[in-house]
Design a protein with these regions (language model features):
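Conserved glycine-rich Rossmann-like NAD(P)H-binding loop of the short-chain dehydrogenase/reductase
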Residues: 28-44
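Conserved glycine-rich cofactor-binding loop
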Residues: 14-16
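Active-site loop of short-chain dehydrogenase/reductase
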Residues: 5-7, 54-56, 83-84, 128-142, ...
Length: 254
């Protein structure tokens, strides 16, 4: 038990990467508030697993496209689990669109969940922490903000905005609250990928491997335990953002 009594709020904490972070932090002594919107059943099941195994978890529900619901999330998390010192803005959507066909509602949903909600949560967390305590915010972004391409237009632009927000939050909330980010690469196949496509994507990484799920909770804990880091993004991506074997280089004399 490293941090018994210091709680963490994880948005989208019931599934995929969020679930792994909830499990890891709970296993290391952090009470966890597992946020969900539609995945309440999965969140309740996860909380039961954590509580059964000796941790402490509660579920807090919010629609992150609704500003009122989002703004109250920190206070409700504190009511559920007690004092919190960590917020992980992990909730995300990942719809495939492009500049030529994006739907305005899909655009709005991406920016609401990826930019407005983390900002409202950070605002509420700053009020909660005040000037006499310390806290950490970790925003889940994507390595592609360092290596953009035109696919997933609304997703990429909103995650790029969250990366800029991470840096400006770090400036605005210092010295009491540090704000950092994690940039995942290929971790789990998405609903559009076949196992073969996902394996091919991983094989294309310069390390020939992506992150394992436990790496995410470990990275959150590293950021918590290292008080000199703020305004940074750690890419857990197998080096995906460093890909360099592009057609303008391969087979060309320079």
């Amino acid at each position: 038990m490293l941090e018994s009594g210091i709680g963490a709020l994880i948005t989208g904490g019931a599934k995929r990467i969020g679930r792994s972070i909830s499990l890891d932090l709970a296993a290391h002594g952090f009470p966890v508030a597992i946020h969900s919107n539609d995945s309440v059943e999965e969140a309740e099941t996860l909380a039961q697993v954590i509580n059964r195994d000796g941790g402490f978890a509660r579920v807090v529900q919010a629609n992150l496209t609704d500003s009122v619901s989002t703004s109250s999330l920190v206070d409700r998390a504190v009511e559920a689990i007690g004092p919190i010192g960590i917020v992980v803005n992990n909730a995300s959507i990942f719809e495939n669109d492009s500049l030529t066909d994006f739907n305005p509602q899909v655009w709005d949903d991406h920016f609401a969940i990826h930019v407005k909600a983390p900002s409202l949560i950070a605002q509420a967390f700053a009020r909660y922490v005040g000037t006499d305590a310390e806290g950490l915010i970790v925003n889940m972004i994507d390595q592609r903000v360092w290596r953009p391409n035109p696919r997933f237009y609304s997703y990429t632009l909103s995650k790029a905005a969250l990366w800029m927000a991470t840096q400006t939050m770090a400036q605005a909330l210092a010295p009491n609250i540090r704000v950092n980010a994690i940039g995942p690469g290929p971790t789990l196949a998405n609903e559009r990928q076949s196992p073969e496509d996902f394996e091919k994507q991983v094989e294309g990484l310069i390390l020939r491997r992506g992150p394992d799920l436990p790496h995410f909770g470990a990275t959150v804990r590293y950021l918590w335990e290292t008080p000199s880091i703020t305004g940074q993004m750690i890419a857990l991506d197998g080096g995906q953002h460093l890909a360099w074997e592009t057609p303008d280089i391969i087979g060309m004399a320079e």
